[in-house]
Curated annotation (Swiss-Prot):
Protein's recorded name: Trigger factor
Protein's organism: Lactobacillus acidophilus (strain ATCC 700396 / NCK56 / N2 / NCFM)
Gene name linked to the record: tig
Places the protein is found: Cytoplasm
GO BP: any one term: chaperone-mediated protein folding
GO CC annotation terms, alphabetical: cytoplasm
């Protein structure tokens, strides 16, 4: 294959390439097969015209357009690979020559990825993370579990925040009832914020048997627009008041909330370990985010083509809607439920698209600089993990995603890990002082 690449701009160029006679012949044969069943030639039954007769009657040139559409995608992809360029978006391709019994020559106007000049990406300074677990953290988790295991017991006297009341209520606006404004024997935890602001507060201090006229104003941004901003009266009857009875903090409690322990001390140790793991994960995520941000900031990229921005927005949109569909919500239903449109969703994803593209370009450049590779074992594991995550057959995943695509994701993660592992944690005060010095020097 004859291929010539000539840059015409920082992210544009012209790719001239040939399509061989053998490829063209295959394309012509396929094009003829597609139209044969509907062909009409005088003296022949419909669909029973040979290729020789077709060429005599219509001329081989009548198949050129269809044949080109058949062979062009593979020919263009091969030319891009041969030229060693990273093409993005859709090229504009025009024929230079399409002579009979000769190779065809095409010229494509192509957008390519911008060049990345890496700066420092090892030893990036990031804010020091504190992963220490304090006694107050353990106590807070124990309190949370006691709350979750609490029993509700009838209470005499006035209701307080944290108590649960059983109520009947009937709401009216301007003396008229409205949909969803009434209920009977409803259990409501005071202070939970379940009801609109002000409702729960007006029940505090009342007892079982009390009738309370609750007066509230629906928020201006309330979901039901016919109620938003309006004052409502709720005739409310309190039937019961219950308070939480927390379990004793002892070995029995420990065994009840976690069957893998036998004592309270064991529960505390397990909580400490779990909290430590959580803090270390949060810390690692923070270090990674800051380190990658630093590596991207240190890199130089000329300009990001619009085609890459649009590809990123398309990817984000398809992934988001795909997640919705896996939850049983099709795009049109989602737009209706959220009162949004596809254009609005695209605009939302477009806000950070340039930064996402720049980050990916820097990570890919690090993959190349460090010569990071994905092994067959890593690709096989990736397929297993994806199949388990999306509840799919491994063969389906393997047929859907190429080894190149999977390998790309694996090596990019390796680049992220490399940046993270080589990051240096320093005191936040030192970083702030350095940032201040950098700003003053500019």
């Amino acid at each position: 294959m004859s291929v010539k690449w000539e840059k015409t701009g920082k992210t544009t160029g012209e790719l001239t390439f040939d399509i061989s006679k053998d490829e063209i012949k295959l394309g012509l044969d396929q094009a003829f097969k597609r139209i044969k069943k509907n062909l009409r030639v005088p003296g022949f039954r419909k669909g029973h015209v040979s290729r020789v007769i077709f060429d005599q009657y219509y001329g081989e040139e009548a198949l050129y357009e269809d044949a080109l559409n058949i062979v062009l995608p593979n020919a263009y992809a091969a030319a891009v690979k041969e030229a060693g360029i990273n093409a993005v978006g859709q090229p504009q391709i025009v024929p230079v020559s399409m002579d009979k019994d000769k190779d065809w020559t095409m010229k494509a106007t192509v957008t390519v990825q911008p060049e990345v000049e890496l700066g420092e990406y090892k030893g990036i300074e990031v804010p020091k993370q504190n992963t220490r677990v304090y006694q107050k953290d353990i106590d807070a988790e124990l309190d949370k579990r006691r709350e979750q295991s609490a029993e509700l017991v009838l209470k005499k006297g006035k209701a307080e925040n944290g108590d649960t009341v059983t109520i009947d209520y009937k709401g009216t606006i301007d003396g008229k009832e409205f949909d969803g404004g009434s209920a009977e024997n409803y259990s409501l935890e005071l202070g939970s914020g379940t009801f609109i602001p002000g409702f729960e507060d007006q029940l505090v201090g009342h007892e079982a048997g009390d009738d309370v006229d609750v007066v509230v104003t629906f928020p201006k941004d309330y979901g039901a627009k016919d109620l938003a901003g309006k004052e409502a009266h709720f005739a409310t009857k309190i039937h019961e008041v219950k308070s939480k009875q927390l379990p004793e903090l002892d070995d029995e409690f420990a065994k009840d909330v976690d069957d893998s322990v036998d004592t309270l001390d064991e529960l505390k140790e397990k909580i400490k370990k779990d909290l430590k793991d959580q803090k270390e994960q949060v810390a690692n995520d923070a270090i990674q985010e800051a380190a990658i941000e630093g590596a991207v900031k240190n890199a130089t990229i000329d300009e990001i083509p619009d085609a890459m921005i649009q590809e990123d927005v398309d990817t984000q949109l398809n992934q988001y809607l795909g997640n919705m569909q896996r939850q049983g919500i099709d795009p049109q239903t989602y737009y209706k439920l959220t009162n949004t449109t596809e254009d609005q969703l695209r605009s939302q994803f477009a806000k950070n698209a340039a930064e996402r593209v720049k980050t990916n370009l820097v990570l890919e450049a690090i993959v190349a600089a460090e010569d990071l590779k994905a092994t067959k074992e890593e690709i096989d594991k990736e397929i297993k993990d994806l199949a388990a995550e999306y509840n799919m057959d491994e063969k389906v995943v393997r047929n859907t995603l190429s080894d190149d695509m999977l390998g790309h994701d694996i090596t990019v993660r390796k680049a992220m890990d490399l940046i993270t592992d080589n990051a240096k944690q320093v005191a936040k005060s030192k970083l702030e002082a350095k940032d201040s010095d950098d700003k003053e020097s500019k």
